[in-house]
UniProtKB/Swiss-Prot annotation:
The keyword NADP does not apply. Residues 36-47 have a biased composition (Basic residues). This is Protein Rev. A motif (Nuclear export signal and binding to XPO1) lies at residues 73-84. Keywords: AIDS, Host cytoplasm, Host nucleus, Host-virus interaction, Methylation, mRNA transport, Phosphoprotein, RNA-binding, Transport. Asymmetrically arginine dimethylated at one site by host PRMT6. Methylation impairs the RNA-binding activity and export of viral RNA from the nucleus to the cytoplasm. The modification Phosphoserine is found at residues 5, 8, 92, 99. Belongs to the HIV-1 REV protein family. The gene is rev. Homomultimer; when bound to the RRE. Multimeric assembly is essential for activity and may involve XPO1. Binds to human KPNB1, XPO1, TNPO1, RANBP5 and IPO7. Interacts with the viral Integrase. Interacts with human KHDRBS1. Interacts with human NAP1; this interaction decreases Rev multimerization and stimulates its activity. Interacts with human DEAD-box helicases DDX3 and DDX24; these interactions may serve for viral RNA export to the cytoplasm and packaging, respectively. Its main location: host cell. It comes from Human immunodeficiency virus type 1 group M subtype B (isolate HXB2). Residues 21-49, 92-116 are annotated as: Disordered. Residues 18-26 are annotated as: Homomultimerization.
Amino acid sequence: MAGRSGDSDEELIRTVRLIKLLYQSNPPPNPEGTRQARRNRRRRWRERQRQIHSISERILGTYLGRSAEPVPLQLPPLERLTLDCNEDCGTSGTQGVGSPQILVESPTVLESGTKE
């Protein structure tokens, strides 16, 4: 990895191998048995996967020195947001359904109070 010493590369590889081992220790559930038994096994498996994911995030966060809280996403002001449907409107199978979207006007135009 560029800009890192070889020692920390080996430590990162060891960390990634540990996380890989955690995920490999929880194989997908057996598809045999009654519907209820399969459902319970899948539910328990998903819970273990969530726990492994949480542990993996904590291990990597500690190793990389990142904060546990995500950085807040900076959004533009609402006045600048528009809905435009000129290209790629909708997903496949829904194109042409409903009325076309229109551009949202700024609040100053909407609040002018003049009648046309």
